[in-house]
Structures are given as structure tokens and as C-alpha cells.
Amino acid sequence: MGQSVVVLGAQWGDEGKGKIVDLLTEEIGAVVRFQGGHNAGHTLVINAKKTVLHLIPSGILRNGVLCLIGNGVVISPAALRKEIEELEDTGLEIRSRLKISPAAPLIMEYHIALDQAREKAAGGRAIGTTGRGIGPAYEDKVGRRGIRVADLHYPDQLAEKLRAALDYHNFVLTRYFGVDGMDFQRIYDEMLVFAEYVEPMKSDVAGILHDLRKQGKRVLFEGAQGTLLDIDHGTYPYVTSSSTTVGGALSGAGVGVQDIDYVLGIAKAYATRVGGGPFPTELDDKIGQGIRDRGVEYGASTGRPRRCGWMDIVALKRAVAINGITGLCITKLDVLDGMDKLKICIAYEYHDKRSEYAPLDAQGWEECTPVYLEFPGWNESTHGITSWEKLPPAARAYLCALEELAGCPIGIVSTGPDREHTIMLHDPFA
């Protein structure tokens, strides 16, 4: 029986991870976020009520489930407090169930200013970040000048670290980008207020996870973004700033390889991408626009329209291999309802040669031309179907083809946004 399950994106993010995490948290001990920040946007629909979470794990809507934020997550104090208060306004008990690693880095105001200044200066070469300071915060972490949750407990040490960081970042902001610098005293005072607020939630997340493992409790590791946006394995430099793979779950939560029993990869029945970067199967036509409209493909965090395209098996197989994915969850099947024909990319034409492997650089991806297999669509509605047998034959054939081509079994199919709109073929915890 699986005790610890990692849920992660197998495409370019926005695959529907939040719904699946919520679905699987009915009888578990904890959900842990292990990377990213409030650039994530996990949308949950329960009894037709929509909730969008950016930083807090998706298990928060389940009473009694412990929600953990690991050391691999970068935390915006303002965003965290806002999200907690919005959830508390709905009557949920949050702070007694939310535990935050002292080793988690903080996103400071100067990180946001730097992120936005860079994107503006880059013009047409911009990465397409959310402008929320995620990348600069990770840079400071690696550069060993980051301020972490633990530093808030020591006011003198906090002041020293903040002055040093501001000296560095204000120089870059004012001298290189020509924008205003940040005021030390105002930021320091705000951090002291946040220190008092976050102190009761500060906990040894890795220690909690080890204890839960010993107790035989189920734990779900919730990824953000997607494998193809991974800082190492994605379409660099059009990537996020953290490790979105199963390796990121280990280092970002503080557990070992032996602590993971099942890796669930989430993929849409088609493909989407936000921001810049290569996207071989992109549909820049009325078909792509139709998918965008039916799938409501607009960012939960930014509202930006998502680029839409056909399912890319070459990219999906790469995600399966990198993560050692045990089973797939295919989401948004119902978005394809009513389409006459569907296509799946099974290979690339690259430099006059056919390849079933993805290039290792963004320029290589840009030079790929997809090779498609065509499948008949279906006119019947799949929305809300909860049984495999009730799916239209053409929909079942499409899913079986995805499974065979990806070389990985499909364990879950999502047929709508609500928690109940799901076909459970295999429970990852079973």
C-alpha cells in the first residue's frame, strides 16, 4: 500500500494538480508543498464553489489535514498572510494546521522590484515571469544572502542580514535599472510584525514528515508548476526557478528516496503553456482559441491567457522518465468534447531527422516540427462522468492511445473541475 505520494505536473504547469491533491486528501495525515511560491495557482471546485490557493497546500479545505510548507518553498509574507486571512474569513481553521519550515526563504520587497525591472528591461526577450519575486528570492538563497523564516526570531541578526541584502540590491536597482531603491527601516519594521505572526506556525517540517512516516500516516507531496518548467530539465531559460521534479520533492521537504511510494504525474488531455518559450504543438488558430475558451485557459495567479496545443507525447515521455512516474492522471478530458478530430504528437522532425526524444535546449525545441497521429473525436459529453465504461468509445480509445504511447498507465481521469468529476481507475494510496 502506498503511504507517501508525490503529485506533480508532467507538462508546463496548470495541469489541474490542485483538484487532484484535494481529491486524494480525504484520509491522509498531511499535504506538503516543496517548491515554488505564490506564483502557483491551484484551483479547487467543491460543490460548485471555487477556491484558488497560491501558497497554502490544497489539503487545507479538508478538516483535520495537516498542511506543511517545506524548506524548498519561497514565502511572500504579504501573500501568505492574505491567503490565511481569506481562508479564515470562510470559517476554516488555518493556523493550527499550517506548519512552516524555518529554512524556507522569504520573498522580500526588493525581490519583487528586481523581478519586474528585469522583465521590463528585457522587452521582447522577457521570460514571462509572474513578477512576484520568485526568481530573485531563489538567487539570494543560492547566493547565501537570503533571509529565511528562522532569521525572524533574531532581530539583531535580521537587521544585519537585511542591511547587507539591501546594500546589494539597491545598488542593482538604482545603478543598473535606474529605479528607486528600498528603505531599510520600513521593511525591517514590517518583518518584525510578520515575525510575531508566523512564529506559532514555525515547525520542523522534515521532522514532522519523518514522524508521520513512522506512524504509518499517509502524506501527499504537492508540486507546483510542471516538469517542463524545471530549472534543470525544462526549456531553459524559459523555466521557473525551482526544481519541479520528484527530486525537488525530496530536497524541498527533507525526505529520502525510500520515503516515496508513488509518483502521480498530472497532464491535460491536450497541452498548454503560459509565457515565453518553445511549444512545438501550439495551435495559433481557431482550434487553439476554441480549446482556450472551452477550457477557460487563463492563469489562476495572473489571468494571462494560456497558449494551447495538442498533446505532446515526446515531452510527456520525458517527464515520465525524469520523475519515474508510476501512474498518470489525465485532466480536462471534457474540454475536447465536440471536436471532429484530435491529434497527438508522437515524434519531432529535427534537422531533417525524425526523433522521439526532446532536445536539451530551448533553441532545439524551437526548431522541432511535430509529427502527429490523428484520432477521431466524439460528440457526446464526457463532463462529470465518473465511470470508464460510460465514456464514449472514441474517448476511451484516445486515452488508451495516450497510455500506450507514453508507456505509463493512466490511474485517474478528470472530467470536470469539481471534486466529484473524476474516474478513479487506480488509487495511488491503494
Curated annotation (Swiss-Prot):
GTP binds at residues 13-19, 41-43, 306, 332-334, 414-416. It catalyses: IMP + L-aspartate + GTP = N(6)-(1,2-dicarboxyethyl)-AMP + GDP + phosphate + 2 H(+). One of its GO terms (molecular function) is adenylosuccinate synthase activity. SMART domains: Adenylsucc_synt (SM00788). IMP binds at D14, E15, G16, K17, N39, A40, G41, H42, T130, R144, Q225, T240, R304. PROSITE patterns: ADENYLOSUCCIN_SYN_1, ADENYLOSUCCIN_SYN_2. It holds the Pfam family Adenylsucc_synt. Mg(2+) binds at D14, G41. CDD domains: AdSS (cd03108). Keywords: Cytoplasm, GTP-binding, Ligase, Magnesium, Metal-binding, Nucleotide-binding, Purine biosynthesis. Its EC number is 6.3.4.4. Binds 1 Mg(2+) ion per subunit. Substrate binds at A300, S301, T302, G303, R304, P305, R306. Pathway: Purine metabolism; AMP biosynthesis via de novo pathway; AMP from IMP: step 1/2. The keyword Ligase applies. Its cofactor is Mg(2+). Its main location: cytoplasm. It is found in: Cytoplasm. SUPFAM superfamilies: P-loop containing nucleoside triphosphate hydrolases. GO terms for biological process: 'de novo' AMP biosynthetic process; IMP metabolic process. GO terms for cellular component: cytoplasm. InterPro entries: Adenylosuccin_syn_GTP-bd, Adenylosuccin_syn_Lys_AS, Adenylosuccinate_synth_dom1, Adenylosuccinate_synth_dom2, Adenylosuccinate_synth_dom3, Adenylosuccinate_synthetase, P-loop_NTPase. Belongs to the adenylosuccinate synthetase family. Plays an important role in the de novo pathway of purine nucleotide biosynthesis. Catalyzes the first committed step in the biosynthesis of AMP from IMP. This is Adenylosuccinate synthetase. It comes from Xylella fastidiosa (strain Temecula1 / ATCC 700964). The gene is purA.
